[in-house]
A protein has these predicted regions:
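Acidic, polar ligand-binding/catalytic clefts
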Residues: 108-172
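Extended ligand-binding regions for polar small-molecule ligands
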Residues: 20, 30-53, 95, 103-104, ...
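C-terminal motif of bacterial Sec signal peptides marking the signal peptidase cleavage site
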Residues: 14-18
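Extracytoplasmic small-molecule ligand-binding "clamshell" domains
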Residues: 29-132
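A ligand-binding cleft/hinge motif common to bilobed small-molecule-binding domains
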Residues: 135-142, 190-193, 221-222, 226-257
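Bilobed "Venus flytrap"/periplasmic-binding protein-like clamshell domains
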Residues: 75-77, 88-103, 135, 153-212, ...
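Periplasmic-binding protein-like
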Residues: 152-159, 240-280, 298-315
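A structural signal for short loop-to-beta-strand junctions that line the ligand-binding cleft
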Residues: 59, 90-94, 141-151, 248-250, ...
Length: 315
């Protein structure tokens, strides 16, 4: 029987990692869950076939190595890039997509687990050909890196299963007690929403802050907060393993601006286009959808991979 995971997560890990301000930290000790999500080292990943027309686009310097060296923050939070139950093997949606891309390019995936800061440095110096680690496209990052998108950057609102509430726009959170991580991207968005609501004469949001995700979920179950706003992948994973909550709305990680998660490579090295075409290949043939479904992230699917789309604005 597959072993299962009920993660105790740090909210800011994914959110700040996507914004590029901190290293992804390891989750605390897991406890049994009931989701059926495979977190063993034997992943039986979805695989793709080599596509010669795409593989031939890979720069010679990379092609000659026979490997696609990919950096990822392997001590991150489920379901992105995290350690399996052997506490060694790096698994998650990010590694699954990297595997599909390597397959299409006809290269062996050489996955390197590293810190968030070292990931960017190693891609910039060429030590890693690419980074797959929930990396959001930003205008500032585009100065040094090229990007090929493969997932939407999304924030989710999670509530108890018996709550009759939907969150689609600012007025939907007026008067609610909302748990959100201090200093996170989602907090910035909700503070702007709250300011709009108060200007329109609506009740203010009562923001609640806790030390870690476990505390947010305890507050949610006890009724101390009405909703919890956090990274969609984390919320989707928790809904799957816990079974007592539901997602009632999502918003772009850029607020009013669409935000994208992308494979990152050194600017101008010629790898961005083959990365994009590899993503597009598995997107077209359905293997991409299989991977997202496996990790309950179907709502973050993109219709097409793009190179260097508009990113989050400079601060």
């Amino acid at each position: 029987m597959k072993k299962l995971l009920y993660p105790i997560l740090l909210l800011s890990t994914v959110a700040l990692a996507a914004c590029g301000t901190t290293e992804a930290a390891a989750p605390a000790a897991p406890q049994p869950g009931t989701s059926g999500i495979n977190i063993t080292a034997q992943q039986n990943r979805v695989r793709a076939q080599k596509v010669d027309a795409v593989a031939n686009l890979v720069p010679k310097a990379v092609r000659d190595t026979g490997k696609l060296t990919v950096g990822t923050t392997g001590n991150g939070t489920p379901p992105l890039s995290f350690r399996a139950d052997d506490d060694k093997t790096v698994i998650g949606v990010e590694t699954d997509i990297a595997q599909l891309v390597a397959d299409v390019l006809g290269l062996e995936l050489d996955l390197q687990a590293t810190s968030w800061e070292n990931l960017f440095l190693s891609v910039e110096t060429g030590q890693y050909a690419a980074g797959f680690s929930n990396i959001t496209v930003t205008e500032e990052r585009k100065d040094k890196y090229d990007f090929a998108t493969y997932r939407k950057d999304t924030i989710a609102f999670e509530v108890k299963k018996n709550r009759d509430v939907t969150v689609k726009e600012p007025k939907d959170i007026a008067g609610l007690k909302v748990g959100v991580g201090s200093g996170t991207n989602q907090e910035q968005i909700l503070v702007r929403w709250d300011e709009q609501n108060k200007a329109a004469g609506l009740k203010p949001v009562e923001f609640q802050y806790f030390q870690n995700t476990t505390d947010y979920y305890l507050a949610l179950q006890s009724g101390r907060i009405d909703a919890y706003a956090g990274p969609n992948p984390t919320a989707a994973y928790h809904v799957a393993v816990d079974g007592q909550t539901k997602i009632v709305g999502t918003v772009s990680g850029g607020g009013q601006i669409p935000a994208d998660i992308a494979a990152m490579t050194k600017k101008g090295n010629g790898l961005a286009e083959p990365l994009r075409q590899a993503v597009q290949s598995v997107l077209t043939n359905g293997q991409y959808a299989e991977v997202l479904k496996r990790w309950n992230l179907g709502n973050e699917a993109v219709e097409a991979s793009r190179i260097n789309p508009p990113g989050l604005p400079r601060k």
